[in-house]
Amino acid sequence: MQYMQGQQVYIIWPKMDFKKNGMYQLATLFGLGRLPGGGTWASLVVLLTAILAKDPSNPLIFFGFVIMFFAPAIYESSLPLFKSKDPKEFVLDEVLGMALAIIIVDIFSDIFGGFAFNLPDYINNKELLFVITFILFRIFDISKIGPVGWTEDPETAPLWWQKSDTTDDAYARVIGDDFMAAFLSSGIVILMLSIYLWAL
């Protein structure tokens, strides 16, 4: 949004206040978490990093470990600024989950050799796998299908799942469903690779 006052142009960025607590800015990935669909935007940052990197796993593993190390402290420090224990604005869980999914797919696509589709020059086979992984990850994370939703809220899970899930840590719930979404989305892509190789 912008408006004129005299000869000056003022630009107002909605839903972004960079003067707030530093931990809050980290938790929301510098305001992305406050945008509509913040988790998707955060996941998209990881996807673009993977596509632009020469070796996607290296930067994702490095930043993944850094974020994983600091994320619990960031979560605890910023929690009083949120309205719930699983705030939608907190998007570091989506960053970690998407990074995990991409790393798994990257490793297995190297092992399997990737698809042999006739793709345009501007996109290689591995980039296609990453885009598919991104789409699947967001579907699982948004819909909370099956184990993803059970991890976030065990009360909605079958009895056998509830008996095996004994954690009561709020952060574990926040991060757990994204890790489950990562395993499911990357698992489907790996299954696609396996079927392709089997069909050769």
What is the meaning of each model-derived region?
Residues 1-4:
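Methionine residue identity
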Residues 62-75:
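Small-polar-interrupted transmembrane alpha-helices in polytopic inner-membrane proteins
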Residues 44-56, 102-105, 159-160, 189:
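Interfacial segments of multi-pass membrane proteins
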Residues 55-60, 118-125:
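Interfacial loop-to-helix junctions that mark the boundaries of transmembrane helices
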Residues 191-200:
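Juxtamembrane boundary at the C-terminal end of a transmembrane helix
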Residues 108-115:
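Transmembrane alpha-helix boundary signature
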Residues 10-44, 73-102, 120-125, 135-184:
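Interhelical loop and helix-boundary elements at the membrane-water interface
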Residues 38-40, 57-64:
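Short, aromatic-rich membrane-interface segments at the entry and exit
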